[in-house]
Amino acid sequence: MRRLVSILFFTLMCVAAFSQNNAADSLYLDSIYRHLELEEYTITARVKEKDIIIPQTLSGAQLKKMNALSVADAIRYFSGVQIKDYGGVGGIKTVNIRSMGTNHMGVYYNGVQLGNAQNGQIDLGKYSLENIEEIQLYNGQKSDIWQSAREFGAAGSIYLTTRRPRFEAGKAFNVKAQMRAGSFALINPSLLFDIRLSETMSITANAELVSSDGKYPFRYRRVTPSGEVAYDTTAIRQNGDINAIRVEAALNHYYSNTGFWKLQLYHYNSERGVPGAIVNNVWRNGERLWDRNSFVQATWQDELFNRWSVRANMKYANDYTRYINNDDKLIRVENQYLQQEFYFTMAHKVRIFDWWDVSAAYDVQYNQLSMFLDAHRWTHWLSAATAINVKNYLRLQASVLGTFVNDAKSTNNGEAHQREAINAKPSTLAEQATNASAASIKWTPALFLSYRPTQLVDLRLNAFYKQSYRYPTFNDLYYTDMGNAYLKPELAKQHSVGLSFTQPFRIAGQKGSEFRINADYYYNRISDKIIAY
């Protein structure tokens, strides 16, 4: 009883003391309120919705953990892709999806497609992971309809996103120097630095050198028709060396939460040997290859009036290739090729309702190739797309793409020729005009669907149908003794139906992990397939 009385007495004393000081405290707090006004901030964010087309993604810590030199080494971890590797550090590395061919694959560097009008091959070994922040692979096309018209024309897409500079508080400079070495005299030094110019503007630059002699040992064994071993030895690979340098720089300006512009420069220069096949005791080939690839591209995007989004990209690329074959058993060959590319795109997206978006985009591109003849191509793309999301139960994405192509070439004597047809060789001028009109304009639709019958579990029915065209490259059309100016474009048709189940879970209390299983039926058919022989 005495303890209870003591507690009550102590409580009353505290209340009394607080009451006596309350008037003085009020005056003090009022003076603070009069002199201190906090700036008001409104923070808004949209709930991230699951993509209708779920990409395979490598980013952040995943890329850092990889013992890889180039983008091609990282893409090997994706399912459904095939890497064609011509061997060694200097070997050309190309990728295709679902065995459709490299030319049906679009590779995008910060949202702008990498091009090669000469042969359509994109060597992913030229692009280092040193400056890459994220790699995404889409089968079909990207989920977001806010994209360039050209992106709707790829049967599969790889998106390479470079690093965005991030600075710690009070720091205006980042630098990273790295030196790697390995077998076969591999040396790979690199330097990366970022400079903060202001709170919204920064510069980043990256340089890298790759050098290797490519002299790796391999087993060479020959067996006679009778089954006896003629010889079994270890040989050294020859003419597989490479010396390459890559330099990148970018100026970034993120002036709002939704708006930014970026100017980027890229340069790659290499000399390498082409080792060739080991047949009939031929240990060395005399082929050498020089590459110089440079481009400058600019990107601007912003969201206007909270409903209308605009994005524009511009690019100029200049590529040089020199090839020499010094094999003394063959006629000496030396070819030089110079490519130029001008590209512009503008894409608009309008949010009509919270569940309905529409977009439209226009792209134009000019390609020119100088060799034994001058080949020119004007290409225009026009797209319209829509996306519907009904309470996250039904998601629908539809698009249509128009592609307009006009090719021309001029020989060394300056005579100009229009590529009249991509059909069977016409016999009359009237047939030529008809075929030219039919060949230069193509329309291709695409439809993607995702249905989730219940919100209790993340079980989805996914389906898509898509058409895409692959136009012949300059080599396909005009290469000496092999080119055919009357080739039709390839028409690819894809459709797929499948189920996916996703279950998120925690590891050691951390969110972000999930278990996902897919079962898909997939079919593709390519008409008028172009095959080199």
Predicted features by range, described:
Residues S26, G214-Y216, T234-R246, N252-R311, ...:
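Flexible loop and strand-edge segments within Gram-negative outer membrane beta-barrel domains
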Residues A72-Q113:
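Extracytoplasmic beta-strand/coil segments of soluble accessory domains associated
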Residues T162, M179-A185, L209-D213, H267-E271, ...:
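Transmembrane beta-strands of outer-membrane beta-barrel pores
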Residues H35-M66:
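N-terminal periplasmic "start-of-domain" segments of outer-membrane beta-barrel proteins
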Residues R311-K315, D319-T321, T454, L461-K466, ...:
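Membrane-embedded beta-barrel scaffold of Gram-negative outer-membrane proteins
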Residues I32-R34, P165-F173, E199-T200, S256-F260, ...:
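Short loop/turn motifs that connect adjacent beta-strands in outer-membrane beta-barrel proteins
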Residues V358-L456, Y465, Y471:
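Signature of Gram-negative outer-membrane beta-barrel scaffolds
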Residues L129-K176:
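A beta-strand signature from Gram-negative outer-membrane beta-barrel systems
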